[in-house]
Amino acid sequence: DFQNLMHVYMDAVFYPNIYQHEEIFRQEGWSYKMDSLEDDLAYNGVVYNEMKGAFSSPEGVLDRVVLNTLFPDTSYANESGGDPEVIPELTYEQFLDFHRRYYHPSNSYIYLYGNMDMEEKLNWLDQEYLSKFDYAPVDSKIRYQEPFDKVIEKEMPYSIASDESEEDNTYISYN
């Protein structure tokens, strides 16, 4: 039911098990993998592998280059899921610091919608979660991108499979 889902989501966001179990970071983020002694050491992890897939799509490459080129001075220039080339640079401590800083009620919007006793739900949220945190100033503003002084051109090569034609995998974006 709705009340139970609110509890599950609020608990997952504000009290995740990542602080008690580093293996969650290793499984979900990134870790080293070696199936046998003959194999090379390789990176692994749910997010790492998902982002490798996202970065292999021509459309995904185009989307990222367009955002990075249009908004280089804002958070939109960065891939929210992480760039697989730099994901392995993330430490467990940096991961926890990021959660402590940004996953805080002071940096949240909570939306409730539907036919319910709104005052009851808001009181519950306050008593069970929000009142247990002190206010913390969080700078999470999305910076304004200043207009460019001149036209910017950007080329981005990407790989395609050997059996794919360049004709069906060539893109141009005019912004």
Residue locations for each model-derived region?
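Non-catalytic beta-strand/loop surface segments
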Residues: 1-3, 22, 35-41, 45, ...
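Short secondary-structure capping/junction motifs at helix and strand boundaries
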Residues: 2, 15-27
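Extreme N-terminal "head/tail" segments of very large remodeling/mechanoenzyme assemblies
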Residues: 25, 29-30, 49
